[in-house]
């Protein structure tokens, strides 16, 4: 089996087809997307960025959301904007951070809402891997970022790729709950067109908008929507010790 560097490393020749093999069944679902001209340009851009300085997440974590949540298992999609831009934080899952990293403010606010909504007991870590393994696709709209510069990789092509992911999830015949927090994420609602799906929208859990986020009870609403469709609800309680991704 190829190692992560060969699967997710960047090609030396920008004109060469990117050697990208998406994890599991996503490779078939998104067949042809990584050979599109925009993706070749994006891949070359990320290569240049990695050569110039730190870019997060690490190459082996680039597609962690897809690796941990196969297409066939997706029941919930929680959309973030771009990865955390501090050293050691991002590991390819929206809102989640690596074990041992301080829980960021937005995730602290998510924990507060979980506590009030479903009786959640916050762990000391910020790893959401256990959600991903239950079918919660923790997807950022932009999959890479330059260290210390939020949104530095916006508008380079990732949005086209992740829009393709959202469209693919929209085509699932079983119910998926799309969770769109904040104005940026809410613009993606137009990609969700199939009537079996449910969209839950609210303000973002960022400290700048948390007053309008708290009290929206998204987690109990997600589970109610899943159960109404005969699907197993998500166990939102995170383990005391983080799962290894």
UniProtKB/Swiss-Prot annotation:
It comes from the Bacteria. PROSITE patterns: U_DNA_GLYCOSYLASE. It is an enzyme of class 3 (hydrolase). The keyword Ribonucleoprotein does not apply. InterPro entries: UDG_fam1, Ura-DNA_Glyclase_AS, Uracil-DNA_glycosylase-like, Uracil-DNA_glycosylase-like_sf. SMART domains: UDG, UreE_C. It catalyses: Hydrolyzes single-stranded DNA or mismatched double-stranded DNA and polynucleotides, releasing free uracil. HAMAP family: UDG. Belongs to the uracil-DNA glycosylase (UDG) superfamily. UNG family. This is Uracil-DNA glycosylase. The gene is ung.
